[in-house]
Amino acid sequence: MNFEIWITYVATVLLLMSTPGPSQLLMLSNAATNGLRRGLFTAAGDLTANLLQMLAAGLGLAALIATSATTLAVIKWLGVAYLVFLGVKQILKARIAAPGDAPRASRKTLWMQGFITSAANPKAVVFFAALFPLFIDGALLFWPQFAILSATYLTIDGLFLTAYGASASWLARRLQGPARLWLDRIGGSFMILAAVLLGLKSLRNAS
């Protein structure tokens, strides 16, 4: 792959990620309440879903998913409902528990939250299927180029998520008492906001 094309691709991905989305908001919430090391399992779940979506795009499944409007709608709204449930649950736990006493979520739970939040946007398959061909040279082998584009995207996304998580974890360590209690509530609100963003995307795509 031409280096200039790769640099253009990197710039494009950076622009696309410049605005926080549902996965970034979830990472903020989980890293603030569970710490960065555990929060990274949320990022791992998100990246796992992204990888599967990329593979689906590379294998030519984009057209199938794009034509299955019912499947898209069901997956999206299940993801929305799941995030709302998590957000409300965290807000209620913050209200009844003493600050800092709430048990941390398991690594498996954090991974699953990240995975479901990303997988709730199955049109990502269509997005990757539309994005990658812009930077693939038809005269070269497809899969090596696909691997480079996929690895680059996952690396950039992982760095963004880690930066969000590190910032939230740093802030959480410096807040105590009532301030920490409000941080937990804000974290729950971030999850609900992530659900709202997913819902708005679904409604916008449906119109």
Stretch-by-stretch model annotation:
Residues 10, 110-114:
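C-terminal ligand-sensing/allosteric alpha-helical core of TetR-family HTH transcriptional regulators
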Residues 114, 119-123:
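Selected transmembrane alpha-helices and immediately adjacent juxtamembrane segments
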Residues 1-4, 205-207:
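Short, strongly hydrophobic alpha-helical membrane anchors
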Residues 21, 121, 188:
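Short, conserved phosphate/pyrophosphate- and ester-handling motifs at nucleotide-, phospho-/glycolipid
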Residues 3-73, 128-154, 165-173:
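Juxtamembrane transmembrane-helix termini in multi-pass membrane transport proteins
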Residues 67-95, 154-164, 168, 175-207:
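Selective transmembrane alpha-helices of multi-pass membrane proteins
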Residues 92-109:
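Flexible cytoplasmic inter-helical loops of multi-pass small-molecule transporters
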